[in-house]
């Protein structure tokens, strides 16, 4: 899908399920429910697009968001950089630490995705 088509997409897969997802009992349950709806995936992100994915860093004693919601701002050989909406700041994500694929979030879905408390902050041991 071209960037212009992505940005102009009227698709919102979350509109009618967001309340059901929010009412799940844990962040991980909300993430699973979210990924069941966001079935379109990519391996490499496109700059300017929104994604969520499961992240498991290798660096010990680092605080991280296991379920980031990001806007991709750059892609490199080592991974990519994104604005993590749960942190409110830019974070780096390396290829080997991403579990599975990146789940695409369309622009009209971002507001609903941000309303779902699926962030899961952990300290890597």
What do these predicted ranges mean?
Residues 4-50:
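Mixed-charge, Lys/Arg-rich low-complexity intrinsically disordered regions
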Residues 43-44, 71-74, 97:
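Short, exposed beta-strand/loop patches in secreted or surface proteins that constitute
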Residues 56-62:
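Short, charged beta-turn/beta-strand-edge "cap" motif at the junction between a beta-strand
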Residues 63-93:
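Basic/aromatic-rich interaction segments and small domains that mediate binding to polyanionic partners
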Residues 84-125:
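Intrinsically disordered, low-complexity, charged/polar segments
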């Amino acid at each position: 899908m071209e960037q212009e088509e992505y940005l102009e997409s009227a698709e919102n897969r979350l509109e009618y399920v967001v309340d059901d997802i929010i009412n799940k009992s844990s962040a991980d349950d909300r993430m699973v429910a979210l990924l069941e709806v966001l079935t379109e995936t990519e391996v490499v992100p496109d700059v300017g697009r929104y994604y969520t994915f499961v992240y498991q860093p290798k660096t010990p004693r680092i605080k991280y968001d296991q379920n980031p919601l990001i806007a991709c701002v750059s892609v490199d050989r080592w991974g990519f950089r994104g604005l993590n909406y749960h942190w409110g700041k830019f974070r780096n994500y390396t290829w080997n630490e991403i579990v599975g694929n990146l789940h695409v979030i369309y622009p009209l879905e971002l507001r609903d995705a941000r309303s779902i408390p699926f962030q899961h902050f952990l300290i890597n041991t």
